[in-house]
Curated annotation (Swiss-Prot):
Reversibly catalyzes the transfer of the carbamoyl group from carbamoyl phosphate (CP) to the N(epsilon) atom of ornithine (ORN) to produce L-citrulline. InterPro entries: Asp/Orn_carbamoyltranf_P-bd, Asp/Orn_carbamoylTrfase, Asp/Orn_carbamoylTrfase_sf, Asp_carbamoyltransf_Asp/Orn-bd, Orn/put_carbamltrans, OTCase_ArgI. Signal peptide: none annotated. This is Ornithine carbamoyltransferase. The lineage of its organism: Bacteria, Bacillati, Actinomycetota, Actinomycetes, Mycobacteriales. Carbamoyl phosphate binds at S50, T51, R52, T53, Q77, R101, H128, P129, C130, Q131, C264, L265, R292. It comes from Mycolicibacterium gilvum (strain PYR-GCK).
Amino acid sequence: MTRHFLRDDDLTPEEQAEVLALAAALKKDPFSRRPLEGPRGVAVIFEKNSTRTRFSFEMGIAQLGGHAVVVDGRSTQLGREETLEDTGAVLSRYVDAIVWRTFAQERLTAMASGASVPIVNALSDEFHPCQVLADLQTLIERKGSLKGLRLAYFGDGANNMAHSLMLGGVTAGVDVTIAAPRGFEPHPMFIAAAETRAHQTGATVAVIDDPLRAADGADVLVTDTWTSMGQENDGLDRVRPFRPFQVNADLLGRADSEAVVLHCLPAHRGHEITDEVIDGPRSAVWDEAENRLHAQKALLVWLLERS
């Protein structure tokens, strides 16, 4: 049976732990696994602009012995002159996996229904699951264990990072609090999914509008841009509600004395996070960015071995 990774809860807690353990091993010995030797091909499709995702996937596929066939979604006929199901079926005859950065989650689901090779969500409007695998790998490196950690996210609770942190975090046994202004809460459907998974792992998930309370005693502070792709023209009216949710020295001072700060990047310095924090001793942002490479390699190896 072909396995896909379209959202964070596509992996069980045990499977997620396997991927993270493999990511750690591949970080120590980058060329120890070569499942794409040949080279075999992986389609890497970008309908949204990308820096970290493109570099990390292209290099990761090369280190696994494969060849990345990178295409701009605008130069293909994805979903225009044939169904996404048909495209998935056709691409499966050419490549061994498909990595896709797209818009609506439904597009991934549609292609996966026709594909016979693994599909990886490299970012959608609803989820950013590869990033959260890298976040979890970083926290294991910094904290040693994930279970029982208190993670607080500050900013737009309706964006893909908030959704993925909820689902991926509680899968790992992390207690997740989303601190967001009123009107910017996570989608109720994804809150419910996170609560279901949290019940299985013993973790907790909460959504509040008080950033100070969320920061109190937290082990991990996470933020993301206040303006996601496609919202750049919304102006000051969009930014204003988020200002109390900035991750700055005062907010960090309320967290645990050994708290770690994460940001998936790109960072809008002076908006969601200050220079003092992102460049400070408790920032793990650069390790987090590097771990995209290792976590995604581990994910591809894991999926290919099971499909």
